[in-house]
Amino acid sequence: MSHEGEEDLLEYSDNEQEIQIDASKAAEAGETGAATSATEGDNNNNTAAGDKKGSYVGIHSTGFKDFLLKPELSRAIIDCGFEHPSEVQQHTIPQSIHGTDVLCQAKSGLGKTAVFVLSTLQQLDPVPGEVAVVVICNARELAYQIRNEYLRFSKYMPDVKTAVFYGGTPISKDAELLKNKDTAPHIVVATPGRLKALVREKYIDLSHVKNFVIDECDKVLEELDMRRDVQEIFRATPRDKQVMMFSATLSQEIRPICRRFLQNPLEIFVDDEAKLTLHGLQQYYIKLEEREKNRKLAQLLDDLEFNQVIIFVKSTTRANELTKLLNASNFPAITVHGHMKQEERIARYKAFKDFEKRICVSTDVFGRGIDIERINLAINYDLTNEADQYLHRVGRAGRFGTKGLAISFVSSKEDEEVLAKIQERFDVKIAEFPEEGIDPSTYLNN
């Protein structure tokens, strides 16, 4: 249970239970489980963490039924066709459902979202007009997606209300929803800026919060302004509550900052940061001149087999221009970036998720946490500047342990340096894309 989120808080690094999960086992789990955010993976009772400090887990589960969840949750899980928890879920849920603080770092696609969704719903005893669960994330689309996960798993819990709040929309609408006891949510998913504004204006009462979750916590807490927003929100909640933090990447520098919000946390890390690359994802690069990118992209879209593709560029201007070019070249595409109006962003995100378009051009607004199951091709039209961001980008393809393909354009000396850093950081060999192409069976699921 956690207390304050102040800068000068003690770090509880001497007390946490730390579980190091073998990355290869986690990947195998992801491959054998159902293709969804709640169920990657088969169980492995012989955890690699057995000899590590505080690595005991009270319950070893072979299926979701062994978590002894509420019947309503179990029904929803069965409806989704889920049977076996992923390695991360297996090690985390038995303690998180009992209120243990959690700091979890595991690669994209291993079902971290389901950990806090199921854990908080399991503990929730809804009281009309009282917010019991707060989930904070850095992106509006991610907030929308998390809200949908709550709706999916609470389908047999009709008394549970969930709402999502983010900037770019009239705060008066949020205030109206919160004021009415018939519509006031028990679960709030929000971006930090909007939730801070609701707290400051006293539109929302967080004095009954029992669970406080930060998704993509490294991104939320590494930016000072966002961290201050989170601290202000944190101080508006009770001292006695559960705090859970999740991310695909957690640097050594950000972990002490996370721990300031936690007390006696269970810590879940993959055993080796170098193994964070995605199992089942084929990764290649293509060396070319900047002026050759458009022609090569068109060739790839013609030659490759894919369900949906996401193309990453470095600016909103380039996103708009490339989308125009693709549409003019008979490649129906949609673009999503941070400079468009919020309603438009959400509408386009939904359109892409609903398979109305197969091609999406985006900036890094789609680079973290967004789960669209049909994406099996990611193209870095402009290579990112950071190795960790590369992981988040290409993680949009090959989600949940399924196969996928990632191709990066390398057009400058800077790109070559970044590519070298990526390979060193993740201990992976990214090969040059063969001139003759590749066998679709290597990146397409049966």
Curated annotation (Swiss-Prot):
The modification Phosphoserine is found at residues 13, 37. Its EC number is 3.6.4.13. InterPro entries: DEAD/DEAH_box_helicase_dom (IPR011545), Helicase_ATP-bd (IPR014001), Helicase_C-like (IPR001650), P-loop_NTPase (IPR027417), RNA_helicase_DEAD_Q_motif (IPR014014). The modification N-acetylserine is found at residue 2. Residues 23-41 have a biased composition (Low complexity). ATP binds at residues 106-113. Residues 280-441 form the Helicase C-terminal domain. It catalyses: ATP + H2O = ADP + phosphate + H(+). It is found in: Nucleus. Its main location: nucleus. The modification Phosphothreonine is found at residue 169. A motif (DECD box) lies at residues 215-218. Residues 93-268 form the Helicase ATP-binding domain. The keyword ATP-binding applies. PROSITE patterns: HELICASE_ATP_BIND_1, HELICASE_CTER, Q_MOTIF. Keywords: Acetylation, ATP-binding, Helicase, Hydrolase, mRNA processing, mRNA splicing, mRNA transport, Nucleotide-binding, Nucleus, Phosphoprotein, RNA-binding, Spliceosome, Transport. GO terms for cellular component: chromosome, telomeric region; cytoplasm; nucleus; spliceosomal complex; transcription export complex. GO terms for molecular function: ATP binding; ATP hydrolysis activity; mRNA binding; RNA binding; RNA helicase activity. PANTHER family: ATP-DEPENDENT RNA HELICASE DBP3 (PTHR47958). Present with 51700 molecules/cell in log phase SD medium. Belongs to the DEAD box helicase family. DECD subfamily. This is ATP-dependent RNA helicase SUB2. It comes from Saccharomyces cerevisiae (strain ATCC 204508 / S288c) (Baker's yeast). The lineage of its organism: Eukaryota, Fungi, Dikarya, Ascomycota, Saccharomycotina. The gene is SUB2.
